Amino acid sequence: MSTDRYVSPLSERYASKEMQYIITPDMKFRTWRKLWIALAETEKELGLNITQEQIDELKAHAEDINYDVARERERQVRHDVMSHVYAYGVQCPKAKGIIHLGATSCYVGDNTDIIVMTEALKLVRKKLVNVIAELSAFADKYKEQPTLAFTHFQPAQPTTVGKRATLWTQEFLLDLEDLEYVLGTMKLLGSKGTTGTQASFLELFDGDQETIDKIDPMIAKKMGFKECYPVSGQTYSRKVDTRVANILAGIAASAHKMSNDIRLLQHLKEVEEPFEKSQIGSSAMAYKRNPMRSERIASLSRYVMVDALNPAITSATQWFERTLDDSANKRLSIPEGFLAIDGILDLCLNVVDGLVVYPKVIEKHMMAELPFMATENIMMDAVKAGGDRQELHERIRELSMEAGKTVKVEGKDNNLLELIAADPAFNLSLEDLQKSMDPKKYIGRAKEQTERFVNEVVRPILNSHKELLGVKAEINV
């Protein structure tokens, strides 16, 4: 840990080493060299005077980057791409004359950005699939556990703990669907020159249009992509960055919603996130068990959601074929968005894997409210016993108000059942009334909906991503 210079908390505290490496300079510069090799191979295969010996020399030094030479050169020329062209040429004297031939800086810069974002999205997908797997297992485990539902954070018709978890799961599934679409449509910039017209290649290939048309598809294939964007200015459209950032923001929104619910449930003592034996909740209040993981999910999620504005504004404000006011913003917003969402997903995995449910507390809260919710059934039973529906409705309203006063003003337990049993209009005993107090009578189809969702919606998706399953997350602090 550095103490004499600023280090982003996203890398020091929150993101995994795997995600951190994807956005490192080392990943970037190694990808530059792969792109230069792909370009040289393509040009050789299409007839330019490039030898196999030159290609082999480039491949021999694809990984052992002479960073010291590149740094010293950049101090002199103030241009990162040309500094690395020079450094590569120092290692490859036979090939130095054909490195970066016909290309502009964006050939390596923008294609690398696409490759890096693609790799980062793959890691996001992997972790997202595992969050969905953990959540669906939790939902299935607690599909029959009745619990109070809340609308406006006021007690409402009961649901189950598992059914509530399906709501969180479904939001992450929508994110996965969006992510898969964007991943499936990622394309490279290709090599189109300074303004996207491929003018330099017209010169190199003596105006042979048919040959030039083969350049981008060949580069894409060599770099593991299906195709390149058909048209561009100097850069790929910054709309691509916007789409990627929106995917991250969507996942962040889903995580934030889940974390909020967990925080509220922890306040009610119905559900708790994992709490380690040596963990300290408060420096002053030693008894505290704060939901700090869920709070951190919410905190980082807000950052990612707001960060999505950066690529959108950058895309909107680009001039003509390109302006450089995208560069500094991209260097911050895209990598940090990925670091933050990586930390969020690790936290989600950790929290969901260790969620603790307290059925007795849930039952206590349920039974405090269930008499109110059972009044319609009670009224129907009383009508069947000979009562008048309208009169009974009015009596239930009056008795409910009286019971509510007992709970809120006097701080006593809900005595609605006792009040109804004592009212001759209902002709029902307390024993009869208590028979209607089984919470499972009031959860509707929550269990069946959960089973169907897990079996028919989630499991087929997990089965199609089996190779991604099995991730366990560790959090640093």
Which stretches of residues belong to each language-model region?
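A helix-coil-helix interface module used to build multimeric assemblies
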Residues: 1-199, 207-220, 281-282, 292-296, ...
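Short beta-alpha connecting loops at secondary-structure transitions
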Residues: 20-24, 69-71, 279-299, 321-336, ...
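Amphipathic alpha-helices that form helix-helix packing interfaces
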Residues: 39-42, 124, 128-131, 135-138, ...
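Glycine-rich cofactor-pocket loops
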Residues: 140-162, 272-288, 321-328, 353-373
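Glycine-rich anion/phosphate-binding loop at the beta-strand->alpha-helix junction
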Residues: 175, 226, 233-327, 331-332
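Active/binding-pocket-proximal capping segment
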Residues: 272, 395-402
